[in-house]
Curated annotation (Swiss-Prot):
This is Zinc finger protein 487. Keywords: DNA-binding, Metal-binding, Nucleus, Repeat, Transcription, Transcription regulation, Zinc, Zinc-finger. Pfam families: KRAB, zf-C2H2. It is found in: Nucleus. Belongs to the krueppel C2H2-type zinc-finger protein family. Its main location: nucleus. The gene is ZNF487. Transmembrane segments: none annotated. InterPro entries: KRAB (IPR001909), KRAB_dom_sf (IPR036051), Krueppel_C2H2_ZnFinger (IPR050826), Znf_C2H2_sf (IPR036236), Znf_C2H2_type (IPR013087). It comes from Homo sapiens (Human). GO terms for biological process: regulation of transcription by RNA polymerase II.
Length: 207
């Protein structure tokens, strides 16, 4: 019993010391004979000063890991990417509501899942080039959040496109046309194998 009580204290569980534990510590008799009736003074629990000190130490350990901005707000910063604000209450358990903001894109978000979704949507797919083996590569470029309302221009043939989706579709088509073009007949292929097969067919036709 004494061992269980000391384990609870070491974990930080604050309870008052039961009378049985007090008697065990002082070496008194644990069982009371029936003819003896305990008085009201014996029912009072023993309060240990050491218990209050341990409780204060446990609270101090948890509070050292965070910075206090004022008496009602608590902010944690992890690598400067995401700032979390917690509201403090009289209850020792922190509130689970988190307001996150993403410094990299400058957007305030309600929760972490929106942060993940916004990071994915802030990258745009831009067809860039075909590599040596004929695989189509997509390079990720950061979208400018301030240029969303402006018409976008594609330098490949000088057409101005107002919507991002139209621009991506246009760039995709232009890149496929430029990817593997066989100059003799003017046909374009998006895979090197198809282009080389067509070259062989064309060369046999000319013989």
């Amino acid at each position: 019993m004494l061992e269980n009580y000391s384990l609870l204290l070491s974990v930080g569980y604050c309870i008052t010391k039961p009378e049985v534990v007090c008697k065990l510590e002082h070496g008194q008799v644990l069982w009371i004979l029936e003819e003896e009736s305990p008085s009201q003074s014996h029912l009072d629990c023993c309060i240990d000063d050491d218990l209050m000190e341990k409780r204060q130490e446990n609270q101090d350990q948890h509070l050292q890991k965070v910075d206090f901005v004022n008496n009602k707000t608590l902010t944690m910063d992890r690598n400067g990417v995401l700032g979390k604000t917690f509201s403090l209450d009289t209850n020792p358990i922190l509130s689970r509501k988190i307001r996150g903001n993403c410094d990299s894109s400058g957007m305030n978000l309600n929760n972490i899942s929106e942060l993940i979704i916004s990071n994915r949507s802030s990258f745009v797919r831009n067809p860039a080039e075909c590599n040596v083996r004929g695989k189509f590569l997509l390079c990720m470029k950061r979208e400018n959040p301030y240029a969303r309302g402006k018409p976008l221009e594609y330098d490949g043939n000088g057409k101005a496109v107002s919507q991002n989706e139209d621009l991506f579709r246009h760039q995709y088509i232009q890149t496929l046309k430029q990817c593997f073009e066989y100059n003799q007949c003017g046909k374009a292929f998006h895979e090197e194998a198809a282009c080389s097969t067509h070259k062989r067919v064309c060369s046999w036709e000319t013989l």
